[in-house]
C-alpha cells in the first residue's frame, strides 16, 4: 500500500541526489500556500477529479507549474497524480519537511516584516530561533507592508506572529 510517507521520503531522496533540498523545500512551502489560496479546494478537486484523465492532469500540471517549479518537484506531482494519490500530496510534503529537518539537522524559517531588518536585528532573531529549535536555522526574509509593524516567523511546523494587522483582525473579530 502506498502512503504519504513513502512519497515524502522519495521526494527528499531525489532532492538530495539533485542537490536541490533547499530549493525544493521552498517550493513545497510555496505550493502549499498556493493550494490554500484556492479556498474552495478547486485545485485539489481538479487534480483528484475522475472527469479528467491522467494525461489531462499531467498536461495541466505542466501548464501550471513547469515554468515556476524545478523539474524534480513537477515530476513529483506527476508521479503522485499518475499513481492516483494526489489526495496525499499535502501529507507527503509534510513528511518531506520532517525528513529535511531531521536528516539535515536544520530548521528552515521565513521571517516576514513590514520593513527591512538590520543585520543586528536579524542576527538576534536567528539566535533566538536557533535556541528555541535547538538546531541550525536557515532563513529567508520577506517584506510585507500590510503587517504595518511587527513580525511573522513561519516554519513547517510553527508560526510566531506579533503585528498590528494581526491585532486589528482580532479586535474586528471581537466586534463582528
From Swiss-Prot:
Alphabetical list of PROSITE patterns matching this protein: ATPASE_DELTA (PS00389)
Pfam families in alphabetical order: OSCP
GO biological process: proton motive force-driven ATP synthesis
Localisation per UniProt entry: Cell membrane
InterPro entries cross-referenced by the UniProt entry: ATP_synth_OSCP/delta_N_sf, ATPase_OSCP/d_CS, ATPase_OSCP/dsu
Keyword tags: ATP synthesis, Cell membrane, CF(1), Hydrogen ion transport, Ion transport, Membrane, Transport
Domain of life: Bacteria
Entry GO terms, CC: plasma membrane; proton-transporting ATP synthase complex
Function: F(1)F(0) ATP synthase produces ATP from ADP in the presence of a proton or sodium gradient. F-type ATPases consist of two structural domains, F(1) containing the extramembraneous catalytic core and F(0) containing the membrane proton channel, linked together by a central stalk and a peripheral stalk. During catalysis, ATP synthesis in the catalytic domain of F(1) is coupled via a rotary mechanism of the central stalk subunits to proton translocation. This protein is part of the stalk that links CF(0) to CF(1). It either transmits conformational changes from CF(0) to CF(1) or is implicated in proton conduction.
Record's subunit section: F-type ATPases have 2 components, F(1) - the catalytic core - and F(0) - the membrane proton channel. F(1) has five subunits: alpha(3), beta(3), gamma(1), delta(1), epsilon(1). F(0) has three main subunits: a(1), b(2) and c(10-14). The alpha and beta chains form an alternating ring which encloses part of the gamma chain. F(1) is attached to F(0) by a central stalk formed by the gamma and epsilon chains, while a peripheral stalk is formed by the delta and b chains.
Protein's name according to its UniProt entry: ATP synthase subunit delta
Gene that specifies this protein: atpH
Amino acid at each position: 500500500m502506498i502512503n504519504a510517507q513513502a512519497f515524502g521520503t522519495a521526494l527528499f531522496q531525489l532532492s538530495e541526489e539533485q542537490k536541490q533540498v533547499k530549493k525544493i523545500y521552498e517550493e513545497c512551502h510555496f505550493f502549499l500556500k498556493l493550494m490554500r489560496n484556492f479556498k474552495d479546494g478547486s485545485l485539489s478537486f481538479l487534480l483528484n477529479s475522475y472527469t479528467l484523465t491522467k494525461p489531462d492532469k499531467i498536461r495541466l500540471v505542466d501548464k501550471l507549474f513547469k515554468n515556476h517549479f524545478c523539474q524534480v518537484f513537477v515530476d513529483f506531482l506527476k508521479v503522485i497524480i499518475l499513481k492516483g494519490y494526489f489526495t496525499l500530496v499535502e501529507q507527503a510534503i509534510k513528511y518531506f519537511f520532517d525528513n529535511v529537518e531531521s536528516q539535515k539537522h536544520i530548521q528552515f524559517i521565513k521571517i516576514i516584516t513590514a520593513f527591512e531588518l538590520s543585520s543586528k536585528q536579524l542576527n538576534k532573531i536567528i539566535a533566538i530561533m536557533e535556541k528555541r529549535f535547538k538546531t541550525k536555522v536557515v532563513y529567508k526574509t520577506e517584506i510585507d507592508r500590510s503587517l504595518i509593524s511587527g513580525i511573522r516567523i513561519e516554519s513547517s511546523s510553527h508560526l510566531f506572529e506579533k503585528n498590528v494587522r494581526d491585532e486589528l483582525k482580532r479586535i474586528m473579530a471581537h466586534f463582528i
